[in-house]
């Protein structure tokens, strides 16, 4: 992500961007504050008795997609700029703790309503693996020099489904896979 691209996204000149932020570090801190705020909003999503758990999980995946697309360079390029900004470092443990609780709540609810056949004592393992695939998928693509295009985020969702879709009710698995495929189709249309 270049400052020229950021300025274009905001509809301002690059010079105006630098007038406001002065340095790349100031710009990174501002983006990081917004990232932490957005992440905390996404982390508020939980299964609800008013919503089908699969619909809730699809909503969670869509929120993750928005987060990864908006802040993809924080995930993908951290090695290039020397690590996270201080606000992310100050919040990272809490963000991971909340992410584990969030995924655990969804997987536990899927088990409770009979959609996921998974041993209770292994839900934490599934939770951590799902987070690892979603969180580090972009970095993996970058480090292995695979194509990184607009469908990369959605591809990470398809990969994370392979962790548990074989233990899902077939109709629920199809709904999740179809939702991920729609994300891929929408992503390809945006890129065209």
Question: Which residues does each PLM region occupy?
Answer:
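Amphipathic alpha-helical packing segments from all-alpha helical-bundle domains
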Residues: 87-113, 124-139, 155-166
């Amino acid at each position: 992500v270049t400052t020229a691209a950021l300025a274009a996204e905001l509809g301002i000149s690059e010079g105006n961007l630098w007038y406001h932020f002065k340095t790349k570090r100031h710009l990174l801190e501002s983006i990081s504050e917004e990232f932490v705020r957005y992440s905390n909003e996404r982390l508020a999503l939980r299964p609800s008795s008013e919503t089908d758990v699969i619909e809730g999980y699809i909503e969670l995946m869509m929120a993750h997609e928005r987060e990864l697309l908006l802040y993809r360079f924080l995930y993908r390029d951290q090695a290039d700029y020397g690590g996270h900004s201080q606000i992310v470092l100050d919040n990272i443990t809490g963000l991971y703790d909340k992410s584990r609780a969030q995924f655990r709540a969804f997987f536990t609810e899927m088990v409770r309503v009979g959609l996921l056949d998974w041993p209770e004592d292994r839900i934490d393992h599934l939770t951590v693996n799902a987070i690892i695939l979603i969180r580090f998928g972009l970095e993996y693509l970058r480090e292995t020099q695979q194509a990184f295009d607009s469908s990369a985020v959605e591809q990470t969702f398809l990969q994370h489904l392979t962790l548990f879709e074989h233990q899902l009710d077939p109709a629920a698995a199809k709904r999740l896979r179809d939702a991920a495929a729609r994300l891929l189709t929408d992503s390809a249309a945006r890129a065209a």
